[in-house]
A protein has these predicted regions:
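Acidic (Asp/Glu)-rich catalytic clusters
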Residues: 75-82, 110-117, 227-228, 258-263, ...
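N-terminal secretory signal peptides that target proteins for export/translocation
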Residues: 1-10
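Alpha-helix boundary/N-cap detector
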Residues: 35, 215-218, 331
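Bacterial N-terminal signal peptides
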Residues: 14-24
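Short, electropositive alpha-helical surface patch
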Residues: 249-261
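Aromatic-lined carbohydrate-binding surfaces of glycoside hydrolases
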Residues: 55-218, 224-228, 232-252, 268-270, ...
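Mature N-terminal, pre-catalytic/accessory segment of carbohydrate-active enzymes
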Residues: 31-59
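Substrate-binding cleft of secreted/luminal carbohydrate-active enzymes
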Residues: 126, 268-369
Length: 369
């Protein structure tokens, strides 16, 4: 009897142990499965085996030039069939050196040069910088009439990271809209497109009392509408990646979603500045919204500084001159292309002209046929 009772107790212990393990495993799996931040964490793996050359497609491929517009001269893109042209960044103060006096001479020069080779130009209009020593807006805006015009933005370590135009200031937006109208009057229908810079900024109300999340969101939408009114024919786009006060999936206030909805509503294309296929912030915000939406407006994605090695120019550990990283890298261009084409279904890709990656990784992957 004692032996039978002992066996029974042992069997019950074994049963409860197994039952507990099953519950724990099920709970762990359930937690992992239901974690919304993990939803797309493995999406990139589908494209790990992609190889060069990338297949021909309907994507409009452009080469991106930031502060190096002179590099378009004799650039390989001019003789390459798969590249439609150049995306070039121009600052607001490049185009408006003095109040109400517009100078588009450098844009005209670049437009005419590319046109000679049958290539198009896509304008990126800069009002934000990532250099504390440089402001992108005209000096006349840096006055009390426009709330100071610009404010320092800060990185995650609290260090100055560049200057952001006060997009939430009504008077400043009025000046921006006038610039867009002047640009559109001369270039709408001629240039391939024009995009506004990213929506992500490092500004909070504690750093500027005139700032509020809602005022900033409203300002973004007003700029989008002004852009569309100025350029009814050329492609218009905004790099909508993040909005202050929100980080999906945990704090979803509907800010970024509303930008995507509004862009679709008024005909402004949507995109992002960094194709980061393994990072949760990007995967859960701009990339998720591009993937999940059903859009009639064009979508675009940029491969910018650092992206060729899985980083961004804002990463604290990013070193553009890291020779070891350059030599040990894997060419992820086929992966990036596959992800953008299939997962995001983009219309435009903007490949930054960064050495040595563009020459050594991008060019060999695109057949010149």
């Amino acid at each position: 009897m004692k032996s039978a009772l002992r066996k029974f107790k042992l069997s019950m212990k074994a049963f409860f142990l197994c039952f507990t393990l099953i519950i724990l495993c099920t709970s762990a799996n359930s937690q992992e499965w239901n974690n919304p931040a993990e939803k797309y964490k493995d999406a990139y793996k589908k494209y790990l085996n992609a190889t060069c050359p990338v297949p021909k497609d309907n994507i409009q491929h452009f080469v991106y030039f930031a502060r190096d517009r002179e590099s378009i001269i004799n650039h390989p893109l001019l003789q390459h069939a798969m590249f439609k042209g150049a995306q070039i960044m121009y600052s607001w103060k490049d185009f408006e050196p003095e109040k109400g006096i517009y100078d588009f001479s450098i844009l005209k020069e670049d437009y005419e040069y590319l046109k000679k080779y049958g290539k198009k130009i896509f304008v990126q209009l800069q009002d934000v910088t990532f250099n504390p020593k440089y402001k992108a807006i005209p000096d006349y805006l840096l006055t009390g009439e426009y709330g100071g015009g610009a404010i320092l933005q800060y990185n995650d370590e609290g260090k100055p990271d560049g200057w952001i135009a006060k997009r939430w200031n009504k008077k400043l937006r009025e000046r921006f809209a006038l610039l867009l109208l002047a640009l559109g009057k001369e270039f709408d229908g001629k240039i391939e497109g024009i995009n506004l810079q990213e929506t992500a900024i490092g500004v909070r109300q504690k750093t500027d009392s005139s700032f509020s999340e809602q005022a900033y969101l409203n300002g973004l939408k007003e700029n989008m509408l002004a852009l569309k009114k100025a350029f009814p024919s050329s492609t218009t786009m905004i790099y909508a990646n993040f909005v202050p006060g929100e980080m999906m999936p945990w704090t979803d206030k509907g800010y970024l979603r509303s930008i995507y909805q509004y862009g679709e509503q008024i005909g402004v294309g949507l995109g992002g500045p960094d194709l980061m296929v393994t990072r949760k912030p990007q995967l859960n915000n701009p990339l998720a919204l591009m993937h999940e939406g059903n859009y009639t407006v064009p979508l675009g994605i940029a491969i910018q500084d650092g992206n060729y090695t899985g980083k961004t120019g804002a990463d604290l550990d990013y070193n553009e001159d890291d020779e070891k990283e350059k030599k040990s890298r894997k060419n992820i261009v086929p992966l990036l292309h596959g992800f953008a084409k299939d997962f995001l279904k983009v219309t435009y890709m903007f490949w930054v002209n960064q050495d040595p990656y563009f020459k050594e990784d991008v060019m060999p992957c695109f057949l010149n046929e």
